């Protein structure tokens, strides 16, 4: 069987995008997702994105995300920007703004005249039980409006903020993001048993009150060149701690994102993320019988 696909990226976070809206697709088993995402024997991607017909009122499309390990996850901000470019470029809609069903609700994606996409990422959640994060036996430390939690990692204690952007994040502020042992600490934090659904680990260096550098070790994908939900979680944590002011420019290895949040006034306000979405190539792959 032949499978048509589009390869895209958002700030270097790369995706295989499949159209399940206008055509029938084979079942997306864990094995098939892993095969497509394999960088040596497949197409290669951090995640696979699936466009489907919505199942809830008020949505134009349904957006599903699969990590390169085959597991389906709740949200991906960089993928959301690629999603709206895909559906417009492939004639599935001519709307500048589309409403998209994801696991935790419906989000709005808007294509701007300059080619960048603005994503309404929704409001962050800080309650540990809803991230989820198990705080039993831990003594938190207040910093601004936030609570930091101690986590033993490779013989050291790391103080983290926990945030949900529809998916779980652990954010810590570091002195030097480039020098920090992300590839050692990231896997340990990702699989810490206090995170029953595992977690995305963010490492943020504050450059100024409106600028940060960020690396993210993503759950099920490892360190990626950019992580949209990770950028939102990091900025929300920094504003809540009193160390950042909106808007914030987030520098990742793959590019730059702009995050805006009026959370200092109202924590129920949505985070808005602006950034690029790029089509790399279109292709067809032969699937094993």
Curated annotation (Swiss-Prot):
GO terms for biological process: lysine biosynthetic process via diaminopimelate. GO terms for molecular function: diaminopimelate epimerase activity. Its main location: cytoplasm. PROSITE patterns: DAP_EPIMERASE (PS01326). Pathway: Amino-acid biosynthesis; L-lysine biosynthesis via DAP pathway; DL-2,6-diaminopimelate from LL-2,6-diaminopimelate: step 1/1. The keyword Isomerase applies. The active site is at residues 76, 227. It is found in: Cytoplasm. InterPro entries: DAP_epimerase_AS, DAP_epimerase_DapF. Belongs to the diaminopimelate epimerase family. Catalyzes the stereoinversion of LL-2,6-diaminopimelate (L,L-DAP) to meso-diaminopimelate (meso-DAP), a precursor of L-lysine and an essential component of the bacterial peptidoglycan. Homodimer. This is Diaminopimelate epimerase. It comes from Burkholderia thailandensis (strain ATCC 700388 / DSM 13276 / CCUG 48851 / CIP 106301 / E264). The lineage of its organism: Bacteria, Pseudomonadati, Pseudomonadota, Betaproteobacteria, Burkholderiales. The gene is dapF.
């Amino acid at each position: 069987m032949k499978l048509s696909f589009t390869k895209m990226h958002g700030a270097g976070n790369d995706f295989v995008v499949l159209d399940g809206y206008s055509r029938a697709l084979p079942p997306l088993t864990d094995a098939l997702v892993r095969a497509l995402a394999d960088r040596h024997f497949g197409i290669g991607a951090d995640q696979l994105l699936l466009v489907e017909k919505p199942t809830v009122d008020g949505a134009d499309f349904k957006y599903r995300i699969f990590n390169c390990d085959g597991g389906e996850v709740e949200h991906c901000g960089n993928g959301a920007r690629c999603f709206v470019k895909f559906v417009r470029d492939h004639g599935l809609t001519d709307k500048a703004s589309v409403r998209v069903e994801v696991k935790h609700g419906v989000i709005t994606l808007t294509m701007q005249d300059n080619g960048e996409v603005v994503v309404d990422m929704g409001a962050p959640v800080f309650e540990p039980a809803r991230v989820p994060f198990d705080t039993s036996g831990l003594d938190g430390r207040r910093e601004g409006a936030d609570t930091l939690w101690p986590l033993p990692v490779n013989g050291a204690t790391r103080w983290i903020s926990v945030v949900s952007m529809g998916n779980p994040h652990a954010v810590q502020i570091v002195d030097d993001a480039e020098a920090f042992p992300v590839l050692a600490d990231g896997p340990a934090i990702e699989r810490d048993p206090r995170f029953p659904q595992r977690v995305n680990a963010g490492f943020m260096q504050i450059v100024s009150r409106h600028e940060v550098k960020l690396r993210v070790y993503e759950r099920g994908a490892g360190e990626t060149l950019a992580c949209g939900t990770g950028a939102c979680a990091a900025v929300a944590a920094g504003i809540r701690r009193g160390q950042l002011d909106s808007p914030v420019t987030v520098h990742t290895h793959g590019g730059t994102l702009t995050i805006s949040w009026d959370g200092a006034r109202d924590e129920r306000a949505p985070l808005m993320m602006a950034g690029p979405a790029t089509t790399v190539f279109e292709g067809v792959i032969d699937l094993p019988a």
